[in-house]
Regions:
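Basic, alpha-helical terminal appendages of large translation-related enzymes
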Residues: 79-81, 104, 108-110, 119-222
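Conserved, charged catalytic cores of large soluble enzymes
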Residues: 51-102, 126-143
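Short, charged/polar, low-complexity loop and linker segments
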Residues: 27-32, 96-104
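Short, hydrophobic, well-ordered secondary-structure elements
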Residues: 44, 48-58, 115, 119-122, ...
Length: 222
C-alpha cells in the first residue's frame, strides 16, 4: 500500500500527508480520497501554484531578475475597517516569525503543527499576491519599482519557506530552490539561524526561465 501511494503521488507528497495527518498522540487516517484532497489543496494549489505564479510574473515583468527597490508599504495606514495596509510588514512578520514557531512545535514533537506553520507562510504569500495585485502594478510604469519589490518579497519569502520545509519534504525544497536560484541552487540554501531574517537574496540573481510543475492536480475519479 505504501509503495502504491509513492508510485501515484511521489515520495514527498506521501511524506507530507503522513506527517501532516498524524496528530500528536492520536491515530491518523490514510485514504485515497484524503490524499487527493491534500495533494490538490495544499501541494498543488497553496505551494505549487504560488511558486509557479511568482516565477512566471518575475519572468514576464523583469526577465527573471527581481530586485529590492525600497518601494515598500511603510506608512500605508489602515483601511476603512481599521485593517493594516502595510502588506509588506505583515508578510515579513509572518515569514521571519515562522522559524521560531516551527522550533516550538518540534520541541514537543508536534510535527504536524510544525508543517502547518510552514504552509501558513505559503498561504500568507498567496494572500500577499491578492493584496498587492502585481498584474495591476504592471500596467502603471510609475509603479515599476513597487512591482519589483513585491516580486522580490515573494521570492525571498518562498526561499525561507523552502528552507524550513527541507527536513519534511527534501526533494520539494531542492526543486523549489533550483527554480529560484537556477545558476547556483546552493545560493538559496540558508543556515537555520538565518531563517528569521528577511532580505538576504542578492539583487542580481535570476529565477528559472521555465518553471516546472511541482505537484499536478489529481482527479479522484481517474
Amino acid at each position: 500500500y505504501a509503495d502504491d501511494l509513492v508510485d501515484l503521488f511521489g515520495v514527498d507528497a506521501v511524506r507530507y500527508f503522513v506527517l501532516h495527518e498524524m496528530p500528536f498522540e492520536n491515530d491518523g487516517v490514510i485514504s485515497w480520497e484524503l490524499m487527493v484532497e491534500r495533494m490538490n489543496s495544499d501541494l498543488a494549489n497553496t505551494l505549487g501554484n504560488l511558486v509557479n505564479r511568482t516565477i512566471a510574473m518575475s519572468n514576464k515583468y523583469f526577465g527573471g531578475n527581481v530586485a529590492k527597490t525600497g518601494a515598500d508599504t511603510t506608512g500605508a495606514g489602515t483601511d476603512e475597517n481599521g485593517a493594516s495596509l502595510d502588506f509588506d510588514a505583515e508578510l515579513k512578520a509572518v515569514v521571519t516569525g515562522t522559524k521560531a514557531r516551527v522550533e516550538d512545535k518540534m520541541k514537543t514533537l508536534h510535527v504536524a503543527d510544525a508543517i502547518t506553520e510552514i504552509f501558513t507562510l505559503f498561504k500568507r504569500c498567496n494572500k500577499y499576491i491578492d493584496e498587492t495585485m502585481p498584474w495591476a502594478l504592471a500596467k502603471d510604469e510609475t509603479k515599476k519599482d513597487r512591482l519589483s519589490e513585491v516580486l522580490y518579497n515573494l521570492v525571498e519569502s518562498i526561499t525561507v519557506g523552502a528552507n524550513l520545509l527541507t527536513p519534511y519534504m527534501p526533494e520539494t525544497s531542492e526543486r523549489i530552490l533550483a527554480q529560484l536560484y537556477p545558476a547556483n541552487p546552493k545560493a538559496g540554501e540558508r543556515d537555520f539561524d538565518d531563517l528569521d531574517k528577511f532580505g538576504l537574496r542578492e539583487n542580481d540573481i535570476k529565477v528559472t526561465e521555465k518553471p516546472e510543475i511541482l505537484f499536478a492536480r489529481l482527479d479522484l475519479e481517474e
